[in-house]
A protein has these predicted regions:
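ABC transporter nucleotide-binding domains
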Residues: 1-232
Length: 232
């Protein structure tokens, strides 16, 4: 059996508010195998999204703080990493698709500028190469006429197209782990099925491990190898 690509041990993430301490995540343990889909399910408010933000060290502080536990990636504890070290990991080794693409995409930058940012920051590409790779990523996620879409702004795209752009951004640097936080929220049923099928196809092609956060057990039954249930 291969070594887990990610191990979370005894994770505790608390929020310190005026009304007291809120244990958003309180002693969480799980591991993710290479190339698998690991699903996290549970009711709203149980800590699913806080878990994903903790892995990427994106908990807003204050009021939130990881007070205990380990997040082991390739033998290194991400909890002990500096912010500078985490910036080199986010989007490169571990990437994330957020719940709502309209609020996650920047409305004042084109699709090409936003996908290209990952290539510029992590791979130091020039403009011409960035443009070429960005078009390739749009084509990979099934967007028609990527040479034209690359110059569009998010408001010019449908919800399904925006989510495909988010997937292209997340997979741009071929991460080892992709965290998909409710990736089909606010999409109609037909588009939901297309997006999940796309994620599965890309996973098989790129060998990426997926942490799928959802409350849809139908989706989980179709694509997940292991499931973790969280509760309040």
């Amino acid at each position: 059996m291969s070594e887990p690509v990610l191990q979370v041990k005894g994770l505790k993430t608390y929020y310190y508010t005026e009304e007291g301490v809120v244990p958003a995540v309180d002693g969480l343990d799980f591991e993710v195998e290479p190339g698998e889909t690991f699903a996290i399910v549970g009711e709203s408010g149980c800590g699913k999204s806080v878990t994903s933000l903790s892995i990427l060290r994106l908990i807003p502080s204050p009021p939130g703080k990881i007070i205990d536990g380990e997040i082991i990636y390739h033998g290194q504890d991400l909890v002990k990493k500096s912010e500078r070290e985490m910036r080199s990991i986010r989007g490169n080794d571990i990437s994330m698709i957020f719940q709502e693409p309209m609020t996650s995409l920047n409305p004042v930058f084109t699709v090409g500028q936003q996908i290209g940012e990952s290539f510029r920051f992590h791979q130091q590409m020039g403009k011409a190469e960035m443009l070429k790779k960005s078009i390739e990523m749009l084509r990979l996620v099934g967007i028609p006429e990527p040479e034209h879409v690359i110059n569009d702004y998010p408001n010019q795209l449908s919800g399904g197209m925006r989510q495909r752009v988010m997937i292209a951004m997340a997979l741009a640097c071929n991460p080892k782990i992709l965290i998909a936080d409710e990736p089909t929220t606010a999409l109609d049923v037909t588009i939901q099925a297309q997006i999940m099928r796309l994620l599965k196809q890309l996973q098989e092609k790129m060998g990426t491990s997926i942490i799928l956060i959802t409350h849809d057990l139908g989706i989980v039954a179709q694509i997940a190898k292991h499931v973790m249930v969280m509760y309040c």
